[in-house]
Design a protein with these regions (language model features):
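Loop-to-helix entry region of an early transmembrane alpha helix in multi-pass inner-membrane enzymes
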Residues: 65, 69, 79-101, 120, ...
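Membrane-lumen/periplasm interface segments of specific transmembrane helices
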Residues: 25, 205-296, 316-331, 379-393
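Extracytoplasmic catalytic/substrate-binding loops of multi-pass membrane glycan-assembly enzymes
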Residues: 32-46, 58-74, 82, 459-463
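Transmembrane-helix motifs of polytopic, lipid-linked glycan transferases
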Residues: 90-113, 151, 155
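Membrane-interface alpha helices of multi-pass inner-membrane proteins
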Residues: 122-123, 166-181, 191-193, 213-219
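Transmembrane-helix signature of polytopic, membrane-embedded enzymes
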Residues: 12, 103-128, 147, 165, ...
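Perimembrane helix-loop-helix junctions
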Residues: 1-5, 158-165, 186-216, 282-306, ...
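Short acidic/glycine- and proline-prone juxtamembrane loop motifs at membrane-interface regions
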Residues: 40, 64, 131-144, 183
């Protein structure tokens, strides 16, 4: 008796323990993510949250604020970007926890005859679908959308047995999906159709009325209440909000001609191909199971009436198909110049996948996956004959596309072959081995997605956070900071605006022209306009810069406050042109074969690049690289300065041509005939090279350094 009671208690509390364990693991997986990297998406939601918490800013946008309300407590509680970002990841992990708990509720309610072991396996499998695991490390709203869609589904099912008024509350939570993201309009429409069907069947015509009044009411509240209130808090410069969502009707302009129709077909193929291979066909098993339940031919009794299953099928099926259609229309466009993930975008529709996947796993047999292959082949064929080229890929938008990390360069047919293989293996492995195999494939995607995310976030921190960190270190909170938004004339430059928006959430960061800044802003001014210095000679001074683009200026009258941070001996011309210095500590991040010692970067007896990078922007002109080093044996040490990822060489010499015994500083001159955006200073050494690098600096050559340039200056 005691044993049975203990087992009953264990089974009752196990779902919560299971959810807590998985949520903790997800938090640990994302712990090393240094910060937001996808701007302005992540930055837009963070800026909303800061404004909600009382930090008025100038970053109003089209991004909806439902998710931002959830992460706003991070800005209430903490006062540094690092601690806020950590708290955002904690909140995301809590949302993931709710997602797993919701999956358990659905299993217990809809599949009461399934064994506990199968319930556990199914919940674990769906919980490890890559999208919600990796989204817990971003400040994208999809982790919130997926969780609240599950909660919406739960109250939808619970309302079957409650009074008519309960549908009012179903409408409220469904409407909140629109607060999280504009695609939330689709579940509202799908819910209205499903509830109307129930009302018709039961002759309870007030059901859809209750649902629609509350859903539309909360939608209108956001559109005409929350949105204007938030916009007022986020336009402190007086300029209009920077809106980016396209008018949906404009998308149809692409379908007026032959190329537009071909693009549409290709994007249909790409989207269907991704969602099929990404879920290993489980999404189609889910839709098939919904159809079977609706026709009362399912093998699994669930305790629900057929008409209730039909309402569920309408809600889930229309939500899935509607969002997929919107995604296809949004990204269909020119046949060239698009990213790969735009051809097969998954992040939107994956927000409604969880209940469909769960129903597919428990409502059908894995062997049925074999019938999914023709769908994938047809979709891949459409994609293959349309996709001629693409620019690059944002892998987090196709989080379950494991082929990206192994077979990207091999093309669609290789992706198709790999997808078919894993689906066939999953179909012919009996449970639980088939389920375990699917989990392994999901984890493979998660592992490589996390590897990409962590390394990319640290690269962003090194390359784009310099200005924001400098301002926080040298100017008090609340200081006005001007940003020359007009000079941010492309996407790559606009990301810095959102970077600063997060890093300076408690400053008065404003979109200002140079003239407006002089009149109304007491703090520094950031611009990409390199001509500012010559136009304002004698008035302003450069004090910091982004490693790649953009310079931070102050007035001469403020110079005394930050004089200790002037770069390169206070040479403003060199500073503005892009001169820089790299210490051996910094070079360690750009070394293949070096080892950091107490005072330098030392060769290790291996051949390879002792240093490379750092991919900086440098203006056209005459320069030289001054290297401080100690040479025991030069060997075959080749020094060059390149750009375009090594495609263009500006100087290529042997260190031995410039070095003489007893010297510890060499200077190598070179010229740039035009601006470069990714300059690399490289030293490739052989196995017999024995040397230590202390630092190097890129400086303007006013004619005093010629080839070969030797110096006997001591290391200082």
């Amino acid at each position: 008796m005691i044993h049975k009671e203990f087992r009953f208690t264990l089974i009752k509390v196990f779902p919560l323990v299971h959810a807590l364990f998985l949520a903790f693991c997800v938090f640990l997986l994302n712990y090393q993510v240094a910060g937001p990297m996808i701007q302005g998406d992540e930055g837009g939601y963070l800026a909303n949250a800061a404004a909600i918490a009382g930090f008025h800013n100038d970053l109003a946008s089209s991004y909806h604020a439902g998710y931002s309300f959830l992460i706003a407590p991070a800005f209430y509680i903490f006062d540094t970007p690092q601690s806020i970002w950590l708290t955002v990841k904690v909140i995301n992990s809590a949302l993931y926890l709710l997602l797993v708990v919701a999956l358990w509720w659905i299993v217990k309610r809809l599949f009461i005859s399934i064994s506990f072991q199968k319930q556990f396996s199914a919940v674990t499998l769906v919980s490890l679908y890559p999208m919600w695991v990796i989204m817990a490390g971003y400040s994208f709203p999809q982790i919130a959308f997926a969780t609240f869609f599950l909660l919406t589904f739960i109250v939808f099912v619970k309302a079957f047995s409650l009074k008519n008024i309960s549908w009012f509350f179903v409408g409220l939570i469904t409407g909140f999906l629109y607060w999280i993201h504009p695609i939330g309009i689709v579940p509202i429409i799908a819910g209205s159709i499903a509830v109307s069907y129930l009302g018709f069947i039961h002759r309870r015509y007030s059901l859809p009325l209750f649902f629609m009044v509350s859903a539309l009411g909360i939608l209108i509240l956001y559109r005409y209440g929350i949105n204007p209130w938030l916009t007022e808090r986020m336009t402190i410069s007086g300029l209009k909000a920077d809106l980016h969502y396209q008018n949906a009707l404009r998308q149809f302009r692409f379908f007026y001609d032959y190329e537009g129709l071909i693009s549409l077909l290709g994007h249909i193929g790409g989207h269907v191909f991704y969602i099929t291979t990404g879920t290993l066909g489980l999404v189609w098993l889910g839709l098939l199971s919904l159809l079977q339940q609706s026709l009362n031919v399912s093998r699994n009794p669930t305790g629900l009436e057929v008409h209730e299953w039909r309402a569920i099928s309408l809600f889930l099926g229309l939500s899935f198909l509607g969002i997929e259609a919107i995604s296809i229309l949004m990204f269909s466009g020119p046949l060239t110049g698009q990213r790969l993930d735009h051809w097969m975008y998954g992040r939107y529709v994956e927000g409604v996948l969880a209940p469909i996947l769960l129903i597919g796993i428990l409502g059908s047999r894995l062997k049925n996956l074999i019938w999914i292959i023709p769908i994938m082949v047809a979709a891949a064929t459409l994609l293959a004959f349309t996709l001629k080229s693409y620019t690059h890929t944002a892998p987090f938008n196709i989080s379950a596309f494991f082929q990206y990390f192994f077979l990207e360069n091999l093309g669609v047919w290789a992706w198709l072959a790999a997808g078919c293989v894993v689906i066939v293996v999953a179909a012919f492995l009996k449970a639980p081995f088939g389920w375990a195999f699917i989990i392994v494939i999901f984890w493979l995607s998660i592992f490589f997605q996390q590897k990409y995310h962590i390394s990319s976030s640290y690269a962003v921190e090194r390359s784009r956070w310099v200005i924001g960190q400098f301002i926080r270190q040298n100017f008090p909170r609340g200081t006005c900071v001007g940003f020359d938004y007009i000079s941010a004339d492309n996407y790559n430059r606009k990301v810095y605006w959102h970077d600063l928006g997060f890093l300076l959430f408690d400053y008065k960061l404003k979109r200002l022209t140079y003239e407006q800044w002089l009149k109304s802003c007491e703090g520094p001014f950031f611009t990409f306009d390199r001509e500012i210095g010559s136009r304002a000679a004698g008035k302003i001074y450069p004090i910091s810069r982004n490693p790649i683009e953009g310079i931070l200026w102050i007035r001469y009258s403020d110079f005394k406050d930050v004089s200790g941070f002037i770069d390169l001996a206070g040479d403003p011309t060199c500073f503005v042109n892009g001169c820089f210095e790299m210490s051996y500590i910094e070079l360690a991040s750009f070394s293949k074969v070096g080892r950091v010692t107490d005072n330098g970067l030392k060769s290790t007896g291996a051949s390879g690049y002792l240093f490379f990078g750092p991919y900086r922007r440098v203006e056209a002109g005459d320069y030289y690289v001054e290297i401080k080093l100690e040479v025991s044996a030069a060997g075959k040490a080749n020094f060059d300065v390149v750009s375009e990822r090594g495609g263009k060489k500006h100087i290529d010499v042997q260190i031995s041509d410039y070095f003489q015994a007893g010297q510890n500083v060499i200077r190598v001159p070179f010229s740039l005939d035009k601006q470069v955006t990714d300059i690399e200073v490289r030293l490739y050494i052989s196995k017999d090279s024995a040397l230590t690098i202390y630092s190097y600096a890129l400086k303007i050559n006013d004619g005093g350094v010629n080839a070969p340039g030797l110096s006997k200056s001591p290391i200082d």
